[in-house]
Amino acid sequence: MIVGDLSRRELGERLAGDGLALQFGPFNLRIRSNLDSFSGLAHRLYEPYPLPDAEAISDFHVQISAPRGLRRWARRQACFGVDGQFPFAPYAVEHAFPALEWGINWCVATRAHHLLLLHSAGVERDGQAILFPASPGDGKSTLCTALVHSGWRLLSDEFGLVRPEDGMLLPLPRLIPLKNESIEVIRKFRPEAVIGPSFLETRKGTVAHVRPPLDSIRRAQEPARPRWFVFPRWVPNAPLTFEPLPKSQAFLMVATNAFNYEVLDGTAFRLVSDMVRFCDSYSLIYSDLDEAVNTLDELSQAGDG
Amino acid sequence: MLWQAWDDVYIVYQPSSAETHVFNETTALILKCLEDGPLSADKVKGQTEAALGVGPGELAKEDFAFATMRLEELGLIESLDETLAIQ
């Protein structure tokens, strides 16, 4: 069963009641909300996502709701909560949707320590994955969005989830939040992309969410083997450069980029070492998405041979 | 400790502090010399020179002293009178 099997009214009742149980890759969430505007958008953008089995345990109980007490009358706000705690200051109610999406990422980044969490986008094709470790603003979400609308499967735009047992990457194909100029870039690059409304003046500027292609969502339980690290950086008007990186440098860039390298101790060292040993690593500077996608297509085709 | 060598760069994971260090070849080889037990500073220097493939005395005293001081600062080795040992 998927979210789209529920009517808008049924979805709203679940959100306002015991919560909407939703499966995002390896995580089961239960989402509650008493905000009508959130319910409408969730129905549209979460439409193809699966509902877990009734007996499945929820990893996170999250909510995005109007605050209680006097505050709710003073100003229309939305509070993100997890397991009954409210870790962030209230958001403008108009920003409830991105606030929940950020909150879910925060839950993964701070709690899912049974996995190595790389701050990285990831895509897969023919069983081989590219990881894009990057800092905010380096263009990893934009590049990732372009690739998943060009024949690659989305693993995640935010997390490289590495399973310690075998080093495989677990998909987490959630909505991709594009920021500012990237929104228009993707609208032009792939007009058919499903993009939600633009939220103006959020804490991260203008944000709009891209729904991943259906194939990525349907294959969310299919792990992938990491094959390449590509460290992207978007530089306006720059000619494309794509250069191999020494493994020692790649190791440091991956390790320092992980959310929980220190938490996982020697396990993280072993996992990063194994990945860097097996993967080829490159730096990519780009300004043109078509050029970048072509370069990575060629890399993938060469890797097949 | 866990080791990973790439080219002439050594990456070392120190379980006692959960820190990962990046060492050049000389520093890493000094540390490796001490993995089997304490040694005098002279012996460590001699074994390091042999591992580096240079002749006795060719590793500058200042370079050796700097590397051992750095390892000691990181809590990876300690000086025991005339000998060095892994902590």
What are these regions (language model features)?
Chain A
Residues P50-D53:
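Cytochrome P450 catalytic domain signature, combining two hallmark sequence patches
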Residues I2-L41, I57-D59, A121-S135, H149-G305:
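Glycine-rich, often acidic-flanked micro-motifs
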Residues L143-C144:
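Post-Walker A alpha-helix
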Residues R111-R125:
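Pre-Walker A adenine-sensing motif
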Residues I57-C107:
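Charged, amphipathic alpha-helical linker segments immediately N-terminal to NTP-binding catalytic cores
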